[in-house]
Amino acid sequence: MVQSAVEVLLPSAWEIEVAVVASVFLIASYWLFAYRGGGDDDVVGVGFDRSRLMQNLDSGDAFDKDKIGHLRGDTQTNAAYIVKVELLAAKNLIGANLNGTSDPYAIVNCGSEKRFSSMVPGSRNPMWGEEFNFPTDELPAKINVTIHDWDIIWKSTVLGSVTINVEREGQTGPVWHSLDSPSGQVCLNINAIKLPVNAPRAVTGYAGAGRRRVTLDQQGPTIVHQKPGPLQTIFDLLPDEVVEHSYSCALERSFLYHGRMYVSAWHICFHSNVFSKQMKVVVPLGDIDEIRRSQHALINPAITIILRMGAGGHGVPPLGTPDGRVRYKFASFWNRNHTLKALQRAVNNYHAMLEVEKKERAQSALRAHSSSVKGGGKVQVKAPEDTAAVPVKFQAFIKEEVLVNIYNDVFASTPEQVLNVLLADDSTYTNEYRSARKDKNLNIEPWHTAEEYDGQVREIKFRSICNSPMCPPDTAVTEWQHVVLSPDKKVLVFETVQQPHDVPFGSYFEVHCRWRLEAKDETSSVIDIRVGVHFKKWCLMQSKIKAGAIDEYKKEVEVMLEVALSYLKSHSSSSSHGDIDKSALSSPTPENIS
């Protein structure tokens, strides 16, 4: 009886051997993947070997060969200079650990921007080879580098810091700077570069957490009627930034810090409070260079986010890579592949949004430039000179692909008469038409030529009555107009782009319209009117906005044609500008407006 109990309770020799072998294997695997490459290497001088630098980086990342995407950004920066700080190495740092070594990482500050280097475990003489790019409006600029010792549980210990003044453009070369501590030096290579206007950040390698929605911010204050979410309470992001996805996961450092990942249209954020050690990572989507499948400890599927060169870490020391970029690795997802696709989709949507905004900014800049030159008198449309040898290609004023036909009929006037009578600078037709619609605060700029477009352009502003229940009583509207008359004066094209400002989703769309008149005989022409809605960004109510805008413009066309015919009739009776068949001057019938 006793012998049977002993056999049941005590393990056999074979079970002991299996347990010991498994323990040794797990310990060896942990040290192999967690501490491979972390040694106490000596730095003798400035010109250290780059191959040694690569060997000292934390490279325990078993990447899947199926790399998911290589992401590039091309946003714009308005900074005058870019200061590139290359953190090369440090030596003779204070030993903060019991074994006389440290786990150093650096925090680099320039103005209000803060970036984290990777952590080099178990070394008083770390090598980094990492670059940090900071935009600045002017020189001199102050660069502060503080070396910390990473602690798994407690707050990091400061090992020393140094502040460098960047006085002028140019590169300093590798220079050792003494820290404000009993021992320790850091080697930096600083290069200040003057940027051309609107230099792409793909060149500067810098997107940053603070650069957000320039076009939206310029529209005025945003009122958000909702409770602050985790992005506001934890990460102090803007009130209108909301969580699109959130995932339970863990951040890999010395071990896995479990927390939660939040994904918005602009950032990937992570928060952990293990051992009451607050860890907050805020990665701007514009700083992401690659998103890869990876593994943690061979058996735990993970996702590695690699940041572009010069971006640096955000909030927590990242992991290093041999090419100088830094990365964050997240593991312990419920569904790694599902999360990976969501992150990839968020980054793609971000860059697509930037491309759309960049095109719209360029288009708006062209219109603003075209409207900045003022002229006077009637519309002066010159016949094009003989440029067969050097053909000129003008830009399209509107998006033709969004237009739909709403009116086609015979109009009792010639294209030249419409240009000289209705659209001339001294004409009061636009004032009468806007008065008939009860619009107010009308301001009409004179016609002038524009290098970007054929013919002439002008800008008008007014406040328009809103009939939609979703809109306020009235809204400010900016309308850009473009007109061109063919050399034989038989075809007139009149195009408009309307931008409402105060309606819901007003910044998301524009109303494009084209009037085309082709001479039929000496007193009439065939008129074709097309209208459409161009969406600069996707929005939920796209179809409803499009249908409402087209219906509203159909009503406008009735009033515009009625006022136009009345104005032409009164003008023909009081001037000798041209003979108009008065019997043909009748109001447009609603049946013609489809």
From Swiss-Prot:
Compositional bias of kind Polar residues: 584-594
Keyword Nucleotidyltransferase in record: no
UniProt-listed GO biological process terms: defense response to fungus
This protein's GO CC annotations: membrane
InterPro entries linked: BAGP1-like, C2_dom, C2_domain_sf, GRAM, PH-like_dom_sf, VASt
C2 domain boundaries: 67-179
CDD domains: C2 (cd00030), PH-GRAM_C2-GRAM (cd13219)
UniProt main location, coarse: membrane
UniProt protein name: BAG-associated GRAM protein 1
The species this protein was found in: Arabidopsis thaliana (Mouse-ear cress)
